[in-house]
């Protein structure tokens, strides 16, 4: 399976994005990474976010990979008891899953947010 992951951070963003890419390289193969996009916080007042999309191959199914992503987020100090729109050490979401040329999963975030669609375009 080919997965495309959206990564974002606005707390120690450079460090947390570097940590995430290092960890993701351990569980994915053939990794490619978009350029980093700086975006304003959306839905709350806060520091700018660094966003990118990372693509890689994995034998893990969607749920197993998602569990791994949550573990990486938690390792960065991610707090889950805060409002949806708030500062983040790290946010990693599966935005696209392909099996060959077939789309298995496509997140609505691709159409909703330029900070997802723009870096994704670089990799597709």
Predicted regions and their residues:
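Extreme N-terminal starter segment of soluble prokaryotic enzymes
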Residues: 1-4
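Short hydrophobic/aromatic beta-strand micro-patches
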Residues: 6, 55-57, 97
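Active-site microenvironments that recognize anionic phosphate/pyrophosphate groups
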Residues: 8-14
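Flexible, gly/pro- and Lys/Arg-enriched active-site loops
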Residues: 12, 41-50, 60-66, 71-124
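Short, surface-exposed acidic-centric catalytic microdomains
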Residues: 14-62
